[in-house]
Amino acid sequence: MAVLDLALQGLAIFGCILFFVLWFMHFLSIVYTRLHLNKKVSDKQPYSKLPGVSLLKPLKGVDSNLINNLETFFELDYPKFEILLCVQDLDDPAVDVCKKLLGKYPSVDAKLFIGGKKVGINPKINNLMPGYEVAKYDLIWICDSGIKVKPDTLTDMANQMTEKVGLVHGLPYVADRQGFAATLEQVYFGTSHPRSYISANVTGIKCVTGMSCLMRKEVLDQAGGLIAFAQYIAEDYFMAKAIADRGWKFSMATQVAMQNSGCYSISQFQSRMIRWAKLRINMLPATIICEPISECFVASLIIGWAAHHIFRWDIMVFFMCHCLAWFIFDYIQLRGVQGGPLNFSKLDYAVAWFIRESMTIYIFLSALWDPTISWRTGRYRLRCGGTAEEILDV
């Protein structure tokens, strides 16, 4: 009986610690968002002295927003940059989109590469290899096809690339679009994701997504170049790790990495979250414990039980109050990341928030159940440590 009492006491203490850690993350991410994101920073170097940048753009297929997204890169206000458009297949409709933009902007230093180069199992790396091999500038900007930018986005990122910084990344967010699926994505990327992403980076944990990353080519080459990361599906994590291992710091851009895909749905969002969870579990096994207890409903139950055990407070009353406080702070976080008025009502936010939170256990269990993922044109079996093998159809 004494052992059981001790175990329950330990669990209650854990619940209290969890409460303080999670609310520290809430406050930290909100304060950082208010102080750093969507702020016009003073130029750290003269415009004409900004370093040259080689933009690597991996392309696969076409959606309704692709040409508009790509065009924003051709309209960048930056002194020296090149655009290296990389398409895997000759018959990909993205080829025609690229040729149209190359014809429309002849003064922009841009080239189209078709065919890729097979160096590993990662299709994105294979696609980018021809562009990477001819990149002429010291800074490499890898930016996904669904991202759109402002004319001064690259200037903002380059100004963050100070002497001791080896990687500048943008906080992923989602552009205003129509439909509930768009609202669901915006709520996730404006609440749960930035809370973890910002808290990790501010406290020194290297957390980077590869949607928009500006890196020093010299450092990547020291790590073996892009080919060194072709064995991984989550190449962005291992690129960031390689840069950090060499003593370089990271910096977050003041502008978000604005996702603007023209193809989106609730099922696509759910599949994407499951794929990401699978990658995290295989790269960082501690995720199996940390991830579920960092979500609102599970955390509220654990903390509510701890409050009942220690203070004899009603579990359900505490659970409801804790969820309500979480809901309100998430809304504050969302408004900060948005940097302006939201494109949907508070009722839409409430529904999307509840559905997103309700999905979390299903997403996590689905990720545990099946270690294979489908990405781009292939299926892959994940291994512990982050490597993967391609599953070939027999």
UniProtKB/Swiss-Prot annotation:
SUPFAM superfamilies: Nucleotide-diphospho-sugar transferases. Pathway: Lipid metabolism; sphingolipid metabolism. Residues 1-10, 216-287, 329-348 are lumenal. It is a multi-pass membrane protein. The active site is at D236. A motif (D3) lies at residue 236. GO terms for molecular function: ceramide glucosyltransferase activity. It is found in: Golgi apparatus membrane. One of its GO terms (biological process) is glucosylceramide biosynthetic process. It is an enzyme of class 2 (transferase). The chain crosses the membrane at residues 11-32, 196-215, 288-304, 310-328, 349-369. Pfam families: Glyco_transf_21. Residues 33-195, 305-309, 370-394 are cytoplasmic. The D1, D2, D3, (Q/R)XXRW motif is a critical part of the GCS active site, involved in catalysis and UDP-sugar binding. Participates in the initial step of the glucosylceramide-based glycosphingolipid/GSL synthetic pathway at the cytosolic surface of the Golgi. Catalyzes the transfer of glucose from UDP-glucose to ceramide to produce glucosylceramide/GlcCer (such as beta-D-glucosyl-(1<->1')-N-acylsphing-4-enine). Glucosylceramide is the core component of glycosphingolipids/GSLs, amphipathic molecules consisting of a ceramide lipid moiety embedded in the outer leaflet of the membrane, linked to one of hundreds of different externally oriented oligosaccharide structures. This is Ceramide glucosyltransferase-B. It comes from Xenopus laevis.
